[in-house]
Amino acid sequence: MLSPKRTRFRKQHRGRMKGISSRGNRICFGRYALQALEPAWITSRQIEAGRRAMTRYARRGGKIWVRIFPDKPVTVRPTETRMGSGKGSPEYWVSVVKPGRILYEMGGISETVARAAIEIAASKMPIRTQFVIAG
C-alpha cells in the first residue's frame, strides 16, 4: 500500500473538494488513461487494487503509471468513545481527486487490451471515470 515515508504533520483538516483538477489532468507518460469524472477521496487500498487488476490483465505487456499518491491522513476515533478528548489517530491514507484528474496511464499495448484493463481498474474505483486516449 502507498503512504508517505514521512510527513511534516501527523494530522490534517478534511478540507473540501471544489472545482475541477488544474494539475495532473493531461496524459504525460502513456497512450491510454483513466480519468476521474467526480470528486472523491481514493484510499491507498483502492489505488493498489486498481493497479493490481490492470497488471494482471495486461500480463507482461505494456507499462502502467499510477498518477495519484495518497498523501492525506484520515483520522478515525475508536468506537464507543465519548466526544471530546482530541482528534482520533491516523488510520489510513487517501488521495484527494477532483474531476478531470488522470488516475492511471498505460502504454505499450493495443487499445483493446488497454481499454479492457482500464475498465477493470475503473470498477475498483468509488467514482465515475472515463477512458481517455492521448492526442
From Swiss-Prot:
Where found in the cell? Plastid, Chloroplast
Protein keywords: Chloroplast, Plastid, Ribonucleoprotein, Ribosomal protein
The leader peptide range reads none
Known PROSITE patterns for this protein? RIBOSOMAL_L16_1 (PS00586), RIBOSOMAL_L16_2 (PS00701)
Q: Which GO terms describe its biological process?
A: mitochondrial translation
Named from the GO MF annotations, one term is: structural constituent of ribosome
**An example Gene Ontology CC term for this record:** mitochondrial large ribosomal subunit
Pfam families assigned:
Ribosomal_L16
PANTHER family assigned: 50S/60S RIBOSOMAL PROTEIN L16, LARGE RIBOSOMAL SUBUNIT PROTEIN UL16M
Q: Which NCBIfam families match?
A: rplP_bact
- Self-association state and partner proteins as the record states: Part of the 50S ribosomal subunit.
- Belongs to which family? Belongs to the universal ribosomal protein uL16 family.
Q: What is this protein called?
A: Large ribosomal subunit protein uL16c
Q: Could you tell me which species this protein originates from?
A: Ceratophyllum demersum (Rigid hornwort)
